[in-house]
Amino acid sequence: MFLCTASCLAGSPHANREGAVPGDSTAILATVTAFHAALAAGDSTAALALLAPDAVVLESGEVETRAEYAAHHLAADIEFSRAVPSQRVVTLVHSEGAVAWVAATSTARGTFRDRAVASQGAELMVLSRTDAGWRIRAIHWSSRRL
């Protein structure tokens, strides 16, 4: 489930700066939302299409290239996203020119691989505008048990 606070749709937390195109915040957020939807749908092709070729993913104390993420953690992230309901709240959407970042928090509760899950997460995504639209250049995920 995806939740968005009012601050993600209006006001200074996601104000665009000089060089930004009107509607960028909506397009940026749509890219992040589409990435999470692809994970939840089990669609690795769609998820990878939203990652820039030079994207890096930081999770579990490691830094992975796009190719390493595709080979290592992507399948587990898809499995987790499909198994454990999560509520995400976007706290910041900000763009300056062709670069943007989105910060979000999440709460996940459920069962994964026969283990109870209750966790709080934080996410930071850095995106850049390309000819194909906004693409994710970096993802940093962290979480803790509730």
Question: What are the functions of these language-model segments?
Answer:
Residues 11-16, 120-146:
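Short beta-strand edge/turn micro-motifs at domain boundaries
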Residues 32, 36-39, 43, 54-55, ...:
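Sec/Tat-exported extracytoplasmic proteins
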Residues 35, 46-48, 55, 69, ...:
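Hydrophobic pocket/interface hotspot
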Residues 52, 85-87, 136:
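Hydrophobic residues on conserved beta-strands that form the core of alpha/beta folds
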Residues 51, 61-62, 105-108, 140:
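A mature extracytoplasmic/lumenal domain signature
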Residues 56, 71-117:
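Surface-exposed, charged secondary-structure patches
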